[in-house]
Structures are given as C-alpha cells and as structure tokens.
C-alpha cells in the first residue's frame, strides 16, 4: 500500500503467509497450518507466531497474510494444508495463538478467508450455502476467537459467495457479524481481484481492495458519490478503519525493518524444527517395527530427496532444505542409509520442441488475446520455453480477466514414446494434437479444469500440439505436463532386498496440492504402483506421507509395517522424520482431521462439485 506523505501515512508492506514470510526471497519455512494444528500445542504455536513476526520485521514487512482459518471440509481442497483442521475449537485456539505471536512483534496478522472458502474448485463463482447455526458452530469460531481474544488487526474476505452474496461485498459478514456482533475494529481487505460491484463494496464491503483499485477506483467512486449512489460517510468509515489500525501499530512512528534481527534466524529455525517434531503423526506401527535404531536402510520415493510443501501463495522458498534422505544419512552412525532415486520423468514439454512446422525455431509460440474467445489478431505474440501463463504480458496491474491464450509447438520424437499427458487450467481449455481435438472442458469461470490422456508417439512422426485457454474471472493458470508412466527399475532390486528397513516417501507436493486447484483423494499417479514394486522385494516398509489432509491408504496400508503422516513439515522436516524413525524422539502429533477409508465416506463427497 503506497504512502500518502501529505497525511503522514507510511507505505505498508504485505507478505503472503501463512507458513513463512513469502517475500520474493528465502525465508524460514515452518510446518504448514494442518501440521501446526496436529501439535495440539498452543504455546508452541504462539512461539511460531513470534518467529514469523521476527522474520517479517527482518524483511520490513508490516502485514503477514495469515493465518488461514477455514475449516477442513473435504480432503480434496487444494489449500487444506494452510488451514487448521476440521475441529472449530482447535482451529480457534491455534489461530488465536498464531495471531498473538505475530502481533507481539509489531506485525499485523491477517486472518483469512472469511468465510466458507472450503474448496478451490470454482472458488470465484461457487456459493457456500450455509445456515446460520452451522456458520456459528463450525465456520465462524476460529475467526471469532481471533477477533475477540487475539484482537487480530486485519481480516481477508474469501473468493466464494456466501449464501449467494460475494464475501467481499456482504453486509452480513462485513457489517453485521464482524463489526456488529464481534466488535471488530480493524480493517477488512479483499483477496486478490475478488471485488465485483463498486456500489456494494462501497456500501457493505471491504475497506481495502487488493491488489489495486478496480471497484475502488477514485474516479469511479467520486462519480458515484456525486450521483448520490454512494454515501461519502461510508467511505470515511473505511478510511478510518485503515488509518486507525496503522496508527495503533505505530507504523507512522518507526521503521518496520528491524536490522537487529537476522533474516536467517537460528531461533526461528529451532522453532520450525520443534514444530516438525511435534506435528508428525504415527498412523501405524506393526509389532513395534519402529524405532529402527541400527542396520541397513533404503530411502526412496518421489518425496525422499526434496523439501515438500504445498503450492500457490502459501509456497515459501526455504532458507535450508533438509530432506528425509539427508536426515537418514546423517542421523546416526549405526544407520547405514542408501538413497535410491525413483525412476520417473515429468516435464512441461516432451523434449526439444519447435515453434514452427519447419522445425527451425526452438520454443513454443505463445499468443495472448484481449478477449475470451481467441478472436481477431493476438495482442501479444512471442516465443517462450514453456506452456504457462506470463502474468505481466498486459502490464503489471492488469488482472488478466476476459483474456485467452494459445500455445503451439511441434515435436518429432527420436524413438517410440508412451506418455501420460496432462493439462491443468482454471476456466476452460481446448487441446489439439495434429489439429484434432483430444481434450476439452467447458469454458467456465474459475472452474479449475484438468484433463488427462495416455499418448503414444512414434519415432520420426511430426506432432503438432496446441493448447487454447480462456480466463474469464479470477487468477489465471494454464499448465501442460508430459509424464513417463512408471516403469519398475530392477537395477536397484538387490539393494532394496538387502535392506532391513525401506523408507518410502510418498504423497502430494506443490505440483498436486495447491491454491486454485483441488487434488485427488488417492496418491498421485504412479505412486501406488511404485510402492507395490518395492513391496515385491521387501516388506519391511515404512511409508512417510506428505499432504494437507486425508489420503487413501486402504489399497496398501495392510502391506506395510509403519505409516507416518508428516504433512508438510517445513525446512527441518527431513531431520524430524529421521529422528522419529530412529527413536531419537517419540511421535507426538495428533490428528486434527478424520481420515476416510474411501472418498465416499466423506459426507460432502456426493455434492462437492455442485
């Protein structure tokens, strides 16, 4: 938010959260919200809040956009990992402690997303229809506790509609509940590009539209005031809410950047480590197979050698990266650990591709249109190296709504290849191979579309790929991926057979669990087959699961010795997991959610996409 020098109002800097200060730089990556909730440790969560506040002050950040306090309703929601589980009381206790910790460091917390934002599917257009009793018993308590007990400074509204009204302009939410019933005296901001009606926003809605003024455009607002459509006193109240909160935190009297605090803070890292240790839940331990204190261990799986976290605005680039493979190799001299890479391949395009049929220009031809139907000449045409959206093509402050794109490339494989071919977009898409329509979905506002097919390509044959994509509302996303199907690697069979313990790291990641799209209940494609291939050679298997919620385990859980739910455990997660496997610490995490045997056991599964 820009400064207004003539009024003595300072610039106010925000950073995404909730599990770290995402500020276009490396920062401490704490365990995700669902992991924090699994600790059931309010004092530790408040320490996390203090540490987040320190990280923010070390970077000159005034407002941390967290915590996320939406209730876990379905395992499919792509942002469950940011939230605090399904229990309203627990979520409220965790949220309140988080806010108190952050704000004790002179940083505003911003609890989000108020209210009923419990899925990413169609989040700009779906209406969460919830009766008043259910709202007050299930969906409101975490926010209410943060207001009444932690005096949270700011609140962010949700993308969805609540009972048919957009949250950013809801009189019921923003006026009657927040200010009337709960006595909230901070300010309310919108989620990014989620204001729709200038009049309703001015009368009943948010105080601050983010990330820039569209409904609150000064010229438009002035005209509406002059016409008598908007009461100027409503605008005065919004300004008062913002200014008094800024003054309450004394942002006008001090520098927010605290140079005495290191950006890479050992104290914050220690808190992240303690949280990781306290969050991991032991779901199974057959015949006390764990702890494993000495002998040969193989560590393998898609999540074994990397920091694993959810994606979207909650993604934080960590200061350090402690994987399970690294942790097991360093944890104890009595442990002889071997990392076995998973034979897999995933890439945005299948190989060297060309923008033209003559195969003279390497890259992908991208075309951007200022209408949603690919009509007329493209406003921008260029060669790029990936199928994906470049958000500043139309300018830094263009929200890229009501636009369409086309990405085209040619590929000639040198050998026969079989791929799993996936498309992931919000809103609609059409995919052509050699000018034949092979995948499509209806062009629909913010519907988070996904397509999948098996694709066999022949050596020497030229293939033309074309992905058309439309964005008519909300954030924009279009991705294409080619995945080689899982093939068992027999070269490592001897190593796996000889191991006394095999730690298989499975689950989701920023690629499959993220903002703006929902995930599957089962493991990502190929992982069950991979686990089965390990079990052929060795049954002494410990599965370490990453994810923001329940994952289907029924097909394989009886075949393995132990299961650890590690959630997204932060930058020290690999060490904490290794400490639990080897008995350096005892697993103490508790489930903040229910885990269904099958998706149909979840009450909302039958109507989730309605």
Predicted segments, located by residue:
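Glycoside hydrolase catalytic-domain context in secreted enzymes
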Residues: 1-418, 424-437, 443-610
